[in-house]
Curated annotation (Swiss-Prot):
Protein name: Putative chloroquine resistance transporter
Superkingdom in the source lineage: Eukaryota
Signal peptide: none
Residue ranges annotated as Vacuolar topological domain: 79-89, 146-153, 201-208, 268-316, 367-376
Taxonomic lineage of the native organism: Eukaryota, Sar, Alveolata, Apicomplexa, Aconoidasida
Keywords: Amino-acid transport, Disulfide bond, Glycoprotein, Membrane, Transmembrane, Transmembrane helix, Transport, Vacuole
Subcellular locations according to the entry: Vacuole membrane
Chief location: membrane
Membrane-crossing residue ranges in chain numbering: 58-78, 90-110, 125-145, 154-174, 180-200, 209-229, 247-267, 317-337, 346-366, 377-397
Glycosylation sites: N87
């Protein structure tokens, strides 16, 4: 008698991940750990877990170190470029986007097309690329306004708020699920930065406005959606990283034009530019960048209406910035592609304390070198500790997901055996 008849899927078995099988082999019986075991044995046990985690994820840790080095150099070279040709932001932005487009398209046609499937090659992702470009442009424009009345310490804290903002939108849209340790780790990072920057804020007398602080925080929302769109494109369509960055750079050449009206806003201080002077500013910008000719040399400087030009050798500094920025974009895309938006968000937050420490070294910071501060190392420790807690939450979730998959497979096997008995 046939009561149930279900199409058999074969003897598919989910093989437990060898990483966690080996991890379990390191773990003694829970009661044995909880009992009065010698302290040395407990320490050895946890050291084995740390060794196992590093060994199995050595690639991502090396990638984090590489990203950190590139990101620090990117920010330092960006500051040097701003110091030399800060009066010509539109020229540097458009020139940089053009360089990125040429480099990414060249790399894609040389290397990317060989590994690109025919389906991807003929599929049009123009809408997704345009959306990413518009979100990036929107984020830059909003941040551009917010930064004008936001002090450096508050800027650093606001950047860390990308963690809870990304967690919220990834939970809402990408259906991410988090462990308690994820929330604890993220909170440790944000609170550490908040406390340190609050202390440092008393050392500065810079102009600050709560309204502009909120505007800067708002710029994190389109940035979060941009990163999530990248993740969807990578995971769903398996698109080539070089292709995405090439086309996005192409669109950004046009979306950067949206920035032009922003320069006429009166509260932009040194970078304020009357509409009638935009054409002259663009011409002088190219003269500064390509020919090294200074235009603004009088009635300029710290506290004045304009920054002074320092165009000699500006093209070298600018090319160095473009190189590290291109590397930054590639590594960012790779992290989002291979891991997730939240992994990138957590990793990117280390750049704050790392950049502060990098300014201790004159060969990196140049004239902007700073004296070491204990608070910078406190920030770095808080970030590392919070990241470890966050990673523990990910490990627990991954292992739980594998166990649930194994249980589902066992249940399906029992049902199949029952069906075979009933139908005999």
């Amino acid at each position: 008698m046939k009561i149930l008849k279900k199409k058999k899927k074969g003897n598919q078995q989910i093989v437990p991940d060898e990483r966690y099988r080996e991890l379990d082999s390191h773990a003694p019986n829970e009661n044995e750990i909880a009992d009065e075991a010698p302290m040395s044995r407990k320490i050895l046990y946890y050291l084995k877990l740390v060794y196992h985690e590093i060994r199995e994820n050595i690639t991502i840790y090396l990638l984090i170190i590489l990203y950190l080095c590139v990101c620090v150099m990117n920010k330092i070279m960006a500051k040097r470029t701003l110091k030399k040709i800060g009066n010509y932001s539109f020229v540097t932005s458009e020139t940089h986007n053009t360089i990125c487009m040429v480099v990414f398209f060249s790399l894609y046609f040389i290397f990317g097309r060989r590994v690109t499937s025919a389906k991807e090659r003929h599929q049009n992702f123009g809408l997704q690329f345009l959306l990413i470009s518009l979100l990036d442009a929107c984020s830059v424009i909003i941040a551009f306004i917010g930064l004008t009345r936001t002090t450096g310490n508050i800027q650093s804290f606001v950047m860390q708020l990308s963690i809870p903002i990304n967690m919220f939108f990834c939970f809402l849209i990408l259906r991410y699920r988090y462990h308690l340790f994820n929330y604890v780790g993220a909170s440790i990072i944000v609170l550490t930065i908040a406390i340190v920057e609050f202390i440092l804020s008393f050392e500065t007398q810079e102009e600050n406005s709560i309204v502009f602080n909120l505007v800067l925080i708002a710029s994190l929302i389109p940035m979060s959606f941009s990163n999530m769109t990248r993740e969807i494109v990578f995971k769903k369509y398996k698109i080539n990283i070089l292709r995405l960055n090439a086309v996005v750079s192409f669109f950004q050449i046009f979306t950067s034009c949206l920035m032009l009206p922003m320069y006429t806003l009166p509260f932009l201080k040194q970078i304020n530019l009357p509409f009638s002077e935009i054409g002259t500013n663009i011409k002088n910008g190219f003269r500064c960048l390509i020919l090294g000719q200074n235009t603004i040399v009088e009635n300029c400087g710290l506290g004045m209406a304009k920054m002074c030009d320092d165009c000699e050798g500006a093209w070298k500094t600018f090319l160095a910035y473009s190189f590290f920025n291109i590397c930054d974009n590639l590594i960012t895309s790779f992290i989002i592609d291979k891991f997730s938006t939240m992994t990138y968000t957590i990793v990117s937050c280390i750049q704050g304390p790392a950049i502060a420490i990098a300014y201790y070294f004159k060969f990196l910071a140049g004239d902007a070198v700073m004296k070491p501060r204990v608070l910078d190392f406190v920030t770095l420790f808080g970030y590392l500790f919070g990241s470890i807690i966050y990673r523990v939450g990910n490990i627990i979730l991954e292992k739980k997901k594998m166990m649930e998959a194994g249980n589902d497979d066992d249940s399906e096997g029992e049902l199949t055996n029952a069906e075979s008995i009933i139908t005999q």
